[in-house]
A protein has these predicted regions:
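N-terminal hydrophobic/helix-forming segments and targeting peptides
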Residues: 1-340
Length: 340
């Protein structure tokens, strides 16, 4: 699975915070254009079409990543920031970051030494109003390279753990992007299947707008949305988490089409693909919520890759879970989808 691993690392290390997905969209286009016709819509979503049968199945994954946005340049070259997506302020102290200015500028989130912290400081994380980034530049130097509105991402080298697990930044949802690219490759040579459309959507982390606009334009009979979800770890509620190396999580929720969820389960069992269930009592917090009500409604299912350390600079997934997620989706498509 080295080629899959390398693709995930390639995707995860690229820029592409919400609303500034240009770099990641180019990388995705490069991968997908090898087997499908690729376009970019007005919103910046990357779409692709693989024609075959009358029925059309849409595969969706969001390509944006969480980060920060520059709001002010202070004296001494320090940057004030706001979060861009669900960045967790608790894990930012002393992190090294990249500011995507006129050229990449490296910086470090400031941190108060414990010797100078008050007891109250130790009890809480800084909020974004008090977070500063040290660039090492003077204000005048910083203003030549950095503008208000430039995006910032946490730097994280990718790597491997034991038992086929990998870590890196932005695996939410670059892992999902890898899943649908891999699934599309697995079915590309078959013509005895439904037509397939791919949607690599922007701005999921700031509200899901890319899925709204993208699914409206891409007419489809049904959709499988792919994202990450919680994987178990110490002190995590086990009933709300999947497990690493135990297969994709098949979503069951009111907004999801129950027949698709059942067909995914049946497909996994028939093809001996390990899977887990993810039960949600209302919405899913993913693009599936928006796609399901697009236009007159699209029957939508959800497949998730279990992930630890979500919304941090170092997220952990199982490479095996990514491969099995792609296999499940490919077998679902080759089986004709719903009501085949």
């Amino acid at each position: 699975m080295d080629s899959l691993k390398n693709m995930i690392f390639d995707l995860s290390e690229s820029n592409g915070t919400s609303g500034a997905e240009g770099e990641i969209s180019d990388i995705i286009e490069n991968y997908v254009s090898a087997f499908a016709e690729v376009k970019k819509d007005k919103f910046g979503n990357v779409t692709a079409y693989m024609p075959a049968g009358e029925k059309t199945i849409l595969l969706d994954a969001h390509m944006d990543r969480i980060g920060m946005i520059v709001t002010h340049i202070e004296d001494g070259g320090f940057l004030r920031v706001a979060k861009c997506g669900g960045m967790d302020a608790r894990v930012l102290a002393a992190q090294d970051v990249t500011v995507w200015g006129r050229k990449p500028v490296y910086g470090v989130v400031t941190s108060t030494p414990p010797h100078l912290s008050t007891p109250e400081d130790a009890k809480k994380a800084k909020d974004f109003d008090s977070i500063l980034i040290d660039t090492g530049l003077s204000k005048e130097e910083a203003e030549k390279l950095i503008s208000w509105g430039d995006r910032i991402t946490v730097k994280c080298p990718h790597g491997e753990l034991e038992n086929g697990r990998i870590f890196g930044a932005a695996l939410d949802d670059r892992a999902g992007c890898a899943v649908i690219i891999r699934a599309a490759r697995l079915v590309a040579e078959s013509k005895d299947r439904p037509s397939v459309k791919l949607l690599f959507s922007g701005q999921e982390e700031t509200g899901g707008d890319g899925a709204v606009t993208g699914s409206y334009n891409l007419v489809a009979d049904e959709c499988l949305s792919v994202d990450v979800s919680f994987a178990d770890a110490p002190d995590m509620p086990s009933e709300k988490c999947g497990k690493l190396n135990k297969g994709p999580m098949i979503g069951i929720a009111p907004v999801l089409d129950y027949r698709i969820s059942q067909k995914l389960k049946e497909t996994a069992e028939a093809k001996k693909i390990p899977y887990q269930l993810e039960i949600m009592g209302d919405s899913t917090g993913t693009n599936a919520d928006d796609i399901a009500i697009s236009k007159g409604g699209i029957r939508t299912g959800l497949v998730s890759v279990p992930q630890r350390n979500m919304h941090t600079g170092v997220e952990i997934i199982s490479l095996e879970d990514v491969e099995n997620s792609a296999k499940l989706i490919a077998e679902y498509i080759l089986g004709g989808g719903l009501d085949a």
